[in-house]
Amino acid sequence: MALVTCHFFSDVLQVSTAMTVLLPQATRSQIGLSGVADDAPPPVLYLLHGLSDDETIWTRRTSIERYAAEKGLAVVMPRGGRSFYADEVHGGAYWTHLTQELPELVSSFFRVSTRREDTFVAGLSMGGYGALKWALREPGRFAAAASLSGALDIVSDQGLRSVVPQVWGGGAPGTGDDLLGLVAAADPAALPALSVACGTEDFLHAANLRWLDAARARGIDVRTDVDRAGDHDWGYWDATIQDVLDWLPIRGR
């Protein structure tokens, strides 16, 4: 695969920012790794980082390049700061950047598919929250969305109290940022395939169960992995992202 560190200016954020991108490359003589690519623009996974991380973290803490190579999958890992992928009250318009500006820049910079059936989103912790929020608010964009140890109940989570003032001001997150509210109002027939994974030792496990209860009450089918041991750490995420990639409905596989 090609590993691209892409620095660019964001008109939405009004600052230079970055993304890490993996692009498929067909390889035959590389020792220990076989890459897959064809003439068609490859499917693309938007892979979001957590609260304390950046656009490089997935490539530094997991073998995402190795896992994606055999699937012919492009992976876009944007910088999201500590924004919860929202338009911050005291900060940047990260939601607008992620959902409007970034896909346009990706398609202009790189040869990747823009078809819904070839487009996926996933993330861990804050990124898991962001992935489901994007899928619930723009279901027509994605074929599948996955949350790994996601912060799925930001309204009730006391651990996020320090983040709320910067992102949402003095009040609680609004309905457009509340995943419990979004899933309760979602049209099950319009949604992409959804997957939620969270280890039983994770401090966010109870929040994941609450969100899954709300999804079931709405009649939404979700692939779940919430009964397996695991904590809020990279050992769990490295293993689980492999399961997610195997689950994605990648064409021709």
Give residue spans per PLM region:
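Non-catalytic cap/lid and distal C-terminal segments of serine-dependent acyl enzymes
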Residues: 1-253
